[in-house]
């Protein structure tokens, strides 16, 4: 006979104050206000006979709570455990701030197409629609009536998916909808929207989406992804973000395709913090980003030049065991270039080769740009030889990038070999950018004869002359004092449709400053007048001795404001050179002062406790000589006022990154020699040094009143 055991247990619950908030998620607050002491009755039944008092040992020890509950656990707890099929992933979630998932880990499944027996006829009809050219919409609509089979759901969907031009797709969609033969499902809208996306027709896509909302048609992940990516292609980032937020409001979770697209949108909008927040929240919910998502992150950090961010992307990919593809490597290489890390870019490229991937044209172009920017000529040429040996793909952009790198560094022989390779190539014949790069190389090396021969060859080949090529050739001929050829090239370029820009005008100004006769100067002035009449008026103004300073100041302001920012300093340099060539030295000093006043020469003067320096690296020869003279005047006045001077004075001309860029340093050294200035060539090239004692002594000899002021 079963025996019933009944016992009473006192249970006391004392919650900690710090845990109140945590327990309030599960218990009502009223439970904590009730009595904390409860009596619970527990009944247990057993088939065994109860022991008598004589059999029960006498003990004074009070049984613990676990001992009292042991009979209950023996009858209510199951001995066998539920088998777990797979090991669950452990994800830590902060209990005080729980976050819901931000995306669905399952991609939107595409609708399966059922077999259509009329597929052959319908595809032939779609091919006819694609090949036909229509000037009027009515012509296309009349042709739709010739559809070989009734436009039911499957037939209409097959034709809609086979059309290529977005105008025809949109018209066919509206035609089917007007028939009202069947309800328009989401897939019809998605197919039409994708076609409109190719045509960058965001307004039509948005109208269709709003129409879906109005008619109660469901918008799925494919719909939202198409809307967002189309807005991104049209640079309508605010619209993309608006539809992404609207997606969340409807309760639909984006899949990884939509999520990667919105990451790219936030990235292009410059919202780095939002991108990282979305990325980290998605990873915390179990998302494993693919190569596309990492490419977005790498591009974002690369455009900002954030090397630490690029390292973060590489570490994340490694920790998640995501192998980058060629697109990701291209993005990261471009990012390394913007961050100024050529060594790391080379290591990344070698890692790509070791992974068994073959670089494409974009990969090689990005690497050549990095090497060219860093002046790594040897590495760039080795890469070129490796390209030819392994027969890697090369296109126009890659060839021209290599040529431009040779032009920047001054590698004439290598550029000629590369240019000849392009001539022998079937697919990559030289274009106007290729010829421009070669003209730049010959111009920088002073090879006027070769430059003219190349120009004539360019005309015979029927290659269009561009303004940059004209500028390079005019500069080369001007340095060679071949003024008649300058006029010939300029006239021919204008006839060929070249529109002069500020760079070409600045080049004509520099040629005018080099003219040794008034006749040559007038020829160049005639060319400049066809390009910029206001500039010619200002040149006549500054060489006139009767022009007052205030007039020069006002006209200078108008000319500079009408000039592109990158051409303003070259303009001022050339104008100073023209004044010095016409023995208008005081006017040259006025123009230098105005240029400094309007911010054209930042960093011209630098001062520390130990040394003062004059940086003329961005100045022309005449402007550098004028700046030196002005600096000496200022130092003479400082000595006159008996102010403190440093122990060392420096003048920096630089050596230039180009092999032929030694003109400024040589001309500046010659000018110092003519002045008998105490500056001497330093061990570092392009730097001239003078001590305080030598400079003060020289200034006192040049300005005798200083001797009495120092006595």
From Swiss-Prot:
Write out the GO MF terms. deoxyribonuclease I activity; rRNA endonuclease activity; rRNA primary transcript binding
Keyword presence, Chloroplast: yes
InterPro entries in alphabetical order: Pentatricopeptide_rpt, Smr_dom, TPR-like_helical_dom_sf
* Extent of the transit peptide: 1-43
Q: Where are the PPR repeats?
A: 185-219, 220-254, 255-289, 290-324, 325-359, 360-394, 395-425, 431-465, 466-500, 501-535
Start and end residues of each Smr domain: 614-696
Mention one GO biological process in which this protein takes part, according to its record: ribosome biogenesis
Record SUPFAM superfamilies: TPR-like
Q: Name one GO cellular component term.
A: chloroplast
Name the source's superkingdom.
Eukaryota
Q: Which Pfam families match?
A: PPR_2, PPR_3
Q: Where, subcellularly, is it found?
A: Plastid, Chloroplast
Q: Which keywords does UniProt give here?
A: Chloroplast, Plastid, Repeat, Transit peptide
| Family in the record | Belongs to the PPR family. P subfamily.
Task: Report what the protein is called.
Answer: Pentatricopeptide repeat-containing protein At5g46580, chloroplastic
Q: Which organism is it from?
A: Arabidopsis thaliana (Mouse-ear cress)
Q: What is the lineage of its organism?
A: Eukaryota, Viridiplantae, Streptophyta, Embryophyta, Tracheophyta
């Amino acid at each position: 006979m079963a025996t019933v055991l009944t016992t009473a247990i006192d249970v006391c619950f004392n919650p900690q104050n710090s845990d109140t908030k945590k327990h309030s998620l599960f218990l009502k607050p009223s439970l904590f206000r009730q009595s904390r002491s409860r009596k619970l009755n527990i009944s247990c039944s057993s088939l065994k006979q109860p022991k008598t008092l004589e059999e029960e040992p006498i003990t004074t020890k009070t049984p613990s709570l676990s001992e009292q509950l042991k009979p209950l656990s023996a009858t209510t707890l199951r001995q066998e455990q539920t088998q777990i099929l797979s090991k669950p992933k452990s994800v830590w979630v902060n209990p005080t701030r729980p976050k819901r998932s931000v995306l669905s880990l399952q991609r939107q499944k595409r609708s399966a197409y059922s077999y259509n027996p009329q597929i052959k006829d319908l595809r032939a009809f779609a091919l006819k629609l694609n090949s036909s050219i229509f000037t009027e919409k009515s012509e296309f609509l009349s042709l739709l009536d010739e559809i070989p089979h009734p436009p039911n759901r499957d037939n209409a969907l097959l034709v809609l998916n086979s059309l290529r031009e977005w105008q025809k797709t949109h018209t066919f969609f509206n035609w089917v909808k007007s028939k009202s033969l069947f309800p328009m499902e989401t897939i019809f809208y998605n197919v039409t929207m994708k076609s409109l996306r190719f045509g960058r027709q965001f307004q039509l896509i948005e109208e269709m989406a709003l129409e879906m909302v109005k008619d109660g048609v469901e918008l799925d992940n494919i719909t939202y992804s198409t809307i967002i990516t189309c807005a991104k292609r049209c640079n309508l980032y605010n619209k993309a973000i608006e539809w992404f937020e609207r997606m969340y409001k409807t309760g639909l979770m984006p899949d990884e395709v939509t999520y990667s697209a919105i990451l790219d949108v936030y990235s292009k909008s410059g919202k780095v913090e939002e991108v990282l927040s979305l990325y980290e929240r998605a990873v915390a919910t179990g998302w494993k980003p693919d190569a596309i998502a990492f490419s977005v992150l790498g591009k974002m950090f690369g455009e900002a030049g954030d090397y630490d961010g690029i390292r973060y992307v590489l570490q994340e990919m490694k920790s998640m065991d995501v192998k980058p593809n060629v697109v990701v490597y291209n993005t990261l290489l471009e990012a390394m270039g913007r961050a100024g890390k050529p060594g790391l870019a080379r290591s990344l490229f070698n890692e790509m080769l070791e992974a068994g991937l073959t670089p494409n044209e974009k990969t090689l172009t990005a690497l050549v740009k990095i090497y060219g920017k860093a002046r790594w000529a040897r590495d760039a040429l080795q890469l070129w030889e490796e390209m030819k040996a392994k027969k890697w793909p090369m296109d126009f952009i890659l060839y021209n990038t290599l040529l431009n790198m040779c032009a920047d560094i001054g590698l004439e022989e290598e550029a000629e070999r590369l240019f000849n390779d392009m001539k022998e190539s079937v697919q990559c014949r030289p274009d106007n950018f290729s010829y421009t790069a070669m003209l730049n190389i010959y111009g920088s090396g002073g090879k006027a004869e070769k430059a003219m021969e190349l120009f004539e060859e360019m005309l015979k080949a029927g290659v269009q002359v561009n303004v940059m090529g004209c500028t390079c050739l005019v500069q080369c001929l001007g340095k060679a004092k071949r003024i008649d050829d300058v006029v010939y090239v300029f006239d021919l370029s204008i006839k060929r449709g070249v529109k002069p820009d500020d760079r070409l005008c600045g080049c004509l100004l520099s040629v005018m400053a080099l003219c040794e006769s008034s006749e040559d100067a007038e020829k160049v002035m005639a060319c400049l007048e066809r390009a910029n009449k206001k500039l010619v008026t200002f040149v006549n103004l500054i060489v006139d001795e009767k022009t007052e300073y205030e007039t020069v100041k006002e006209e200078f302001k108008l000319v500079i404001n009408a000039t592109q920012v990158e051409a303003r300093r070259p303009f001022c340099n050339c104008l100073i050179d023209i004044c010095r060539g016409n023995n208008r030295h005081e006017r040259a000093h006025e123009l230098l002062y105005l240029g400094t006043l309007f911010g054209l020469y930042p960093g011209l003067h630098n001062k520390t406790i130990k040394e003062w320096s004059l940086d003329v690296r961005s100045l022309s020869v005449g402007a550098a000589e004028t700046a030196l003279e002005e600096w000496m005047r200022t130092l003479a006045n400082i000595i006159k006022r008996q102010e403190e001077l440093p122990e060392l004075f420096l003048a920096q001309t630089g050596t230039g990154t180009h092999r032929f860029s030694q003109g400024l340093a040589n001309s500046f050294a010659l000018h110092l020699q003519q002045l008998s200035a105490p500056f001497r060539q330093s061990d570092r090239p392009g730097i001239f040094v003078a001590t305080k004692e030598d400079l003060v002594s020289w200034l006192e000899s040049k300005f005798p009143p200083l001797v009495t002021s120092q006595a």
